Amino acid sequence: MAWSPPATLFLFLLLLGQPPPSRPQSLGTTKLRLVGPESKPEEGRLEVLHQGQWGTVCDDNFAIQEATVACRQLGFEAALTWAHSAKYGQGEGPIWLDNVRCVGTESSLDQCGSNGWGVSDCSHSEDVGVICHPRRHRGYLSETVSNALGPQGRRLEEVRLKPILASAKQHSPVTEGAVEVKYEGHWRQVCDQGWTMNNSRVVCGMLGFPSEVPVDSHYYRKVWDLKMRDPKSRLKSLTNKNSFWIHQVTCLGTEPHMANCQVQVAPARGKLRPACPGGMHAVVSCVAGPHFRPPKTKPQRKGSWAEEPRVRLRSGAQVGEGRVEVLMNRQWGTVCDHRWNLISASVVCRQLGFGSAREALFGARLGQGLGPIHLSEVRCRGYERTLSDCPALEGSQNGCQHENDAAVRCNVPNMGFQNQVRLAGGRIPEEGLLEVQVEVNGVPRWGSVCSENWGLTEAMVACRQLGLGFAIHAYKETWFWSGTPRAQEVVMSGVRCSGTELALQQCQRHGPVHCSHGGGRFLAGVSCMDSAPDLVMNAQLVQETAYLEDRPLSQLYCAHEENCLSKSADHMDWPYGYRRLLRFSTQIYNLGRTDFRPKTGRDSWVWHQCHRHYHSIEVFTHYDLLTLNGSKVAEGHKASFCLEDTNCPTGLQRRYACANFGEQGVTVGCWDTYRHDIDCQWVDITDVGPGNYIFQVIVNPHYEVAESDFSNNMLQCRCKYDGHRVWLHNCHTGNSYPANAELSLEQEQRLRNNLI
């Protein structure tokens, strides 16, 4: 009897008590997941669900091909890399797969080879992790994203208003016109039969407008009839070709997208029955929110968005997106993502003057907030004017954490700004020499931007206008990038932005262009990224650790060398005497979506001989003592001599440590602690008299490193000093309270510590 090689191998493995290599056939219908940082759903430990139990994958023979297949099965476009040796922590339960072998073209892991289910000689210290490209396949819905497109979303993906009246054509953005939908590459009309204001509300929401107004249908009907009587009219030609695609739409008005409405598609061409008998194209008129109205537009009536809303968005890269925060009990707080959906998210978007919600995001996808979690299980019906009108539970009732902070991405009007800026010469699409389009003598012209005064704030506006997220670098020299040959002329100079502008063209700039160094190699450039870190201080720790110390001058030589003492110390009789120091600890969290890293590499760090350490950021924090009217009476600063992960929450591992000239940074979710007993962790108040003051700490004060939100970089406390003792109270980050609450808090004496 002859034995074939496969049969021999099979029998041999059975004699050894080992099952043969197999291809797990059920994996195609079995779920995969990544277990890692909440703010980075595209990376983590790879786990597989088999027989109702989650298990891990061993890193033996795992490489980029296997990572690519896993990422593709998870809905991501590609894999960036993989991680071995349990980089994302050791898993629990079985190790389901070992020696996974893929070619790289498979659509799922079930098409790859392996040892078989549960057959492994690995331990959990070998659990593999993968890092996928954050961009998902078109149409793929993330488990942490609720997307607006419904079952017919592919056909109804694009909607626009085609202006008819001359006045509407001159308006930017277009707020009134005939509704058109794009189908098979062609724009089609929508019949007005049965058209309601609810339909208009949905269309306006999709286009980024918070509300709709009735149109003069009789006037538009006259225009329609007039054009239909003209045999040369393009409209008559389109109608004869049965260009209507949607015969009838029925919306409730709460839908975030027309795809969620009942849609009756018009009969195909060639049918005897006309698509819109006796009707015409549907016409809609929308009202733009305050961000998108022309400057001369009259303010809205009382009771509209002109009132300061009690909801805001934070840490979003684009206008109309961010973590949802609400104002309750005079304090800003977040919203838990339990039962968070597009209906509730749309109420937030419209309240802020945007359109309906494009996405409702869960799991702190746009960073974690601070302070209280005010709301949970928000249940809006869609007609509410504000989020506070919706039924909800208190956030503390169901154990929500800031890992569950809800966020939104709203529909915003197309202002055309993205077509007025571009990047040239970069290695990747997210970087390059900045080129803008401006009008010169009434003619649009492309050119470059002078780099004088160019900084991270201006670069942030540029990246936002480009739709590329946050700016991570603002380049003042761009000789290493070649621009577009016809855009070499400097057409914009003296750019100064506040950071809230939608486009560089809205920033302050020179009238006539004036670039003293003439441009050339000194042209503005940017590097953008879709996510950024976010540093926030622990206010309670500062308040609890503050005390006074009279420190002898003999122990302050190094601190004096690093300018950590007041100027009066220069005139003292060293080493005799002392300085009175207000000391405290600071704890700085990174609640963003990427690690906080120094601006420069290790080769550029400055060595300080006295303290014998490197400074990766020369001025990392400012410490100030202010009078109640804001005048500075004492100051201090702290260089970043050791930017590291002092500690991390359970489930995250420290990645940065300063020992042995190691890499510096703060991992997402971790924190860096500067204890009260280290040098320069103080404010020198030797020359300050008794009184009431404001104690202020600002981290990353010069914006040297990009962050998703700079408004929470400042911490303030009320400070009482009687000449012998000091009290700090009411410590809070700079944007925790509205302005009127700040004034009220200053009058309240909530003394929580008495540390001398």
UniProtKB/Swiss-Prot annotation:
Source domain of life: Eukaryota
Protein name: Lysyl oxidase homolog 4
Alphabetic keyword roster: Copper, Disulfide bond, Glycoprotein, LTQ, Metal-binding, Oxidoreductase, Repeat, Secreted, Signal, TPQ
Cellular-component GO terms for this entry: collagen-containing extracellular matrix; extracellular exosome; extracellular space; membrane; receptor complex
Transmembrane segments: none
GO molecular function, one term: copper ion binding
Residues found modified as 2',4',5'-topaquinone: Y674
Gene that this sequence comes from: LOXL4
Keyword Repeat (UniProt): yes
Cofactor(s) this protein requires: Cu cation; lysine tyrosylquinone residue
PROSITE patterns listed in its UniProt record: LYSYL_OXIDASE, SRCR_1, SRCR_2
Function of the molecule: Catalyzes the oxidative deamination of lysine and hydroxylysine residues in collagen and elastin, resulting in the formation of covalent cross-linkages, and the stabilization of collagen and elastin fibers.
Signal peptide feature range: 1-24
Site (Cleavage): A569, D570
Post-translational modification note: The lysine tyrosylquinone cross-link (LTQ) is generated by condensation of the epsilon-amino group of a lysine with a topaquinone produced by oxidation of tyrosine.
Species in which this protein is naturally found: Homo sapiens (Human)
Cofactor: binding details: Contains 1 lysine tyrosylquinone.
One GO term of the biological process aspect: collagen fibril organization
